[in-house]
C-alpha cells in the first residue's frame, strides 16, 4: 500500500518548534503563544497573515526545519508501516524558506525516515497514494472530496471539529489502524 505522510505535526513538531524559535528570536514571548485551538492560528498568537508568513520564512531559513527530534511515536509508526511492507511517501505543503525540499530531506534523513518519495504540494490529492495522514482539516476535506482515503492525525487544533473522519494518534496510530486488518480497505474515508 502507498501511504502519503504529512510532515508538520505528523512527523515533525512544527507548532512546538516554531514556538521555540519565535521565543528565542524575540518575535513573541512564550506567554503570547498559547496552544493553538485551530489549524490557522497566526491570529491566536497576535500576528497578521503577512507578518506570520515573513516570520515563518525567516525561521525556516534559520534552520527550523532541519533541527529537533520527531514527534513521539513517529519513528515507531514509520518502522511498523515499513515492516508491514507499505511504501511511504512524504507529502507536505511546506513552502516556507528558500529551500523547503532540501530542509525537509535533511531532517528526514537525520531521523531515519527513508521515504520512497518526497512531494511538496498543496494539491496532495494528485499524489498517487492509497491513504493519507494529515493534521489539517482543510487538507483532509480536500483529499476526501477527491475520493481519497484520508486519516486525520489528532491534534488540539482539529480535535473539536465535527465530522466523521477517521482519527488516529499520529503515525503510530495509523500503523495500528492499518495493521489491525484494515490495510486492504480501498473506499475513501467517510465524509
Language-model-detected regions and their locations in the chain:
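Substrate-recognition element of Asp-dependent hydrolases with the DxDx(T/V) motif
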Residues: 64-70, 74-104
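Structural recognition of alpha->loop->beta junctions
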Residues: 105-121, 163-188
Amino acid at each position: 500500500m502507498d501511504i502519503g505522510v504529512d510532515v508538520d505535526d505528523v512527523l515533525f513538531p512544527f507548532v512546538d518548534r516554531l514556538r521555540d524559535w519565535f521565543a528565542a528570536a524575540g518575535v513573541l514571548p512564550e506567554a503570547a503563544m498559547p496552544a493553538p485551538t485551530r489549524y490557522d492560528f497566526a491570529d491566536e498568537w497576535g500576528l497578521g497573515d503577512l507578518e506570520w508568513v515573513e516570520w515563518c520564512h525567516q525561521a525556516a531559513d534559520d534552520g527550523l526545519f532541519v533541527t529537533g527530534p520527531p514527534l513521539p511515536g513517529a519513528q515507531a509508526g514509520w518502522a511498523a508501516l515499513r515492516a508491514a511492507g507499505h511504501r511511504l511517501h512524504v507529502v507536505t505543503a511546506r513552502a516556507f524558506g528558500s529551500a523547503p525540499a532540501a530542509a525537509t530531506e535533511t531532517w528526514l534523513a537525520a531521523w531515519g525516515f527513508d521515504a520512497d518519495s518526497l512531494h511538496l504540494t498543496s494539491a496532495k490529492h494528485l499524489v498517487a497514494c492509497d491513504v493519507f495522514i494529515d493534521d489539517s482539516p482543510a487538507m483532509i476535506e480536500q483529499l476526501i472530496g477527491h475520493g481519497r482515503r484520508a486519516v486525520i492525525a489528532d491534534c488540539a487544533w482539529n480535535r473539536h471539529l465535527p465530522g466523521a473522519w477517521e482519527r488516529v494518534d499520529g503515525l503510530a496510530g495509523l500503523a495500528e489502524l492499518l495493521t489491525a486488518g484494515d490495510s486492504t480497505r480501498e473506499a475513501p474515508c467517510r465524509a
